[in-house]
Amino acid sequence: MTDIQRIAKKITWVLFITQSLASAGFIAAAAINPILGAKLASDRSLATLPVAVYLLSGAFSASAWGYIMDRIGRRNAIVSGLVLGILGNALVLVAIESASFLLVLIGLMLMGITNSAVQLGRFAAAEVNPPNQRGRAISAVVLGGVIGTVLSRVLAVPVSNFAVSIGMDELAGAYLTTLALFAIGAVIVFVGLRPDPRDVGREVAELYPELIPHGEARPISQILREPAAITAVTAMALGQVVMVAIMVITSLHMEDHQHTRSDIYSVISAHTFGMFAPSIISGWLLDKWGRGKMILFGAFILLLACIAAPLSPDVLPLGIALFLLGLGWNFCFVGGSTLLSDQLSPVERSRTQGANDFLVGLASAFISLSSGFIFAASNYTVIAIVAGVISLIPLFMVLFWMRKKPLPVVG
């Protein structure tokens, strides 16, 4: 094993651990955010506004993080993002105690910025690995969400009980958990993410010359006119839209059917397990079979999830449907991320990937806010129908792209 390979392995492991801790925090908060919104908002239709603000802030900060990562490095940028998340969680805790809906929005805005920084870590893992291992590297980082799923489920109820025991609201437990996990993650990144992936990625680019030229960076507008890039961004953006549309409202749907908090955590955990556990094989499948087939399969699974979700309000059927929702998202997300990374030179990656995450976040923020209004005016079934129709767009678009210009298998 060469020095570069050892460094790449170490960086991937550090990013995996960071993703595990951060995901546990985000998942713990995600199950509670709509419930907290419904509790503090003056209008029930605004229940998902905190989630929309969270997603929107992540979207608008994604491009900025791309520039920041190029300027100060991946390590310093991710640490800065986690510190903002710690502050955001502290504000939400104050908001719960003071019943301030505005403070909740500000706190979740900061947490959205944190999520944007952490999510770009998957591209840092890709850039330090050779082209034929990038799918597996991205999957390895995304796989940290499996640990996050288990960790959030294990901590959720005990920490909520602890919050109550010290005189805090039960809902505060999720944000206490997230604050602590972000703090641990920040220390691990600051100490362990050395040398910086930005610098390692430049060395890897010299060792593994690619078809994409290494000279002057193309404008983002030009890159996003390429068929493969359009396909990748569409898969990620609309896969995220379908997932968010159903996931964000499921907690409220279950509360309306008198489910316990433990039931809600179980269903959300099944969903996040579906999001992250398939990364064990999805990266290998991407590198072996090609990006397009996996994205196509993911879009089809999303459609199945949309059909299954409204069939029953019971925990088991909902858990299965939400697991499928996460599985379809995983294939679209990892497949799209890898396909996009394939199209970019080292000098184009951070900014283009930041722009991609902006588009993905913007789309998911819009559907998050829309879901609140749709749910208040109708029901869960209508949301599932809307999401199902949207899932057809990437399905047919990827199929068309594969027929017109199939991407050669990497490796």
Map each language-model feature to its residues:
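Hydrophobic core of transmembrane alpha-helices in multi-pass small-molecule transporters
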Residues: 20, 101-116, 317-331
